[in-house]
From Swiss-Prot:
Organism: Homo sapiens
Major localisation: membrane
Bilayer disposition of the protein: Multi-pass membrane protein
Subcellular location: Membrane
Stated name of the protein: Putative sodium-coupled neutral amino acid transporter 11
Gene behind the chain: SLC38A11
Glycosylation sites (chain numbering): N44, N275
GO CC field: membrane
GO biological process, one term: sodium ion transport
Membership in a protein family: Belongs to the amino acid/polyamine transporter 2 family.
Cytoplasmic face of the membrane: 1-7
Record lineage: Eukaryota, Metazoa, Chordata, Craniata, Vertebrata
GO terms, molecular function: L-amino acid transmembrane transporter activity
This protein's record includes keyword NADP: no
Amino acid sequence: MKQAGFPLGILLLFWVSYVTDFSLVLLIKGGALSGTDTYQSLVNKTFGFPGYLLLSVLQFLYPFIAMISYNIIAGDTLSKVFQRIPGVDPENVFIGRHFIIGLSTVTFTLPLSLYRNIAKLGKVSLISTGLTTLILGIVMARAISLGPHIPKTEDAWVFAKPNAIQAVGVMSFAFICHHNSFLVYSSLEEPTVAKWSRLIHMSIVISVFICIFFATCGYLTFTGFTQGDLFENYCRNDDLVTFGRFCYGVTVILTYPMECFVTREVIANVFFGGNLSSVFHIVVTVMVITVATLVSLLIDCLGIVLELNGVLCATPLIFIIPSACYLKLSEEPRTHSDKIMSCVMLPIGAVVMVFGFVMAITNTQDCTHGQEMFYCFPDNFSLTNTSESHVQQTTQLSTLNISIFQ
């Protein structure tokens, strides 16, 4: 919303969600037409080995970079949660982001990622969905109680802003699940295109409204102060938001294994013929997670990670490759709706990818990692804590980092 402009941002959210819905169904249709059951094999059969290699790189990089971003979010978010524990020194190394990233990796994400069957993560996904609902409620509550006290930036309500293409990249990052779509499709009891279509339609509708609520409430609260991780904008001494941070940190930790499954599958398909022995399954999983963890320890600015992953990886996986595969495989007439939409998506995806990358490099976001905003200081504003303790709290203006959305 900060990059695109609030009205245009809402319209782009609906548009990206529609394109995502269409391309997810198109992808499975392409698999049915080609008789393939993985994204890589579909592209291999359609465009040969060069296409297979390109897709493999993209399909590995997107979830791998997502794993890095989830580690960054977990470290930043949970460190602030533990700092709120009475008697805990904020400078204690054991509540620092580096220690938390390492601990969460060893304790949760690595064991969950060692599963072989993605269907076993179903209960984990259900927990994540429940926590997301709680987080949304907290963001909405703070939009009502905190938003009116924060000054709005001068250009807060303009229809469109120059960085709208970058916003499309971030939105693509949020909606994409193409890299694991065949994994989910094959886990259905009766995998058919019709059943997949119904599942996707329902999932996308729910997702887009959750995203709109998050984006709207977050932007209405902080307007132009918004950053890449929404919780960076809230004050550290807000107990309700602290609970939200905890839920958010748990959610991204539980989402992490889904991405690891995809990176491991790509490696298995490219280097091991699609099958990993028990030993190599463990070795590959540990290696991927170790590298992702080390990189996340060196990076603490989320915004640029989301943008680059969105425009370089998510955009071709959503817009370009499914459309290109379907156009080459389908024997439907040129006037068929699927072919018309594919012809529209393909060039738009190319434009978003090229210009989004250029703009992400030339117009980098400010990243005020770990800094409190001016409205959180006692001299600027005080807000009565609405939690059960009714303790008087003060609030400061932190630059809004919206990892849910911009």
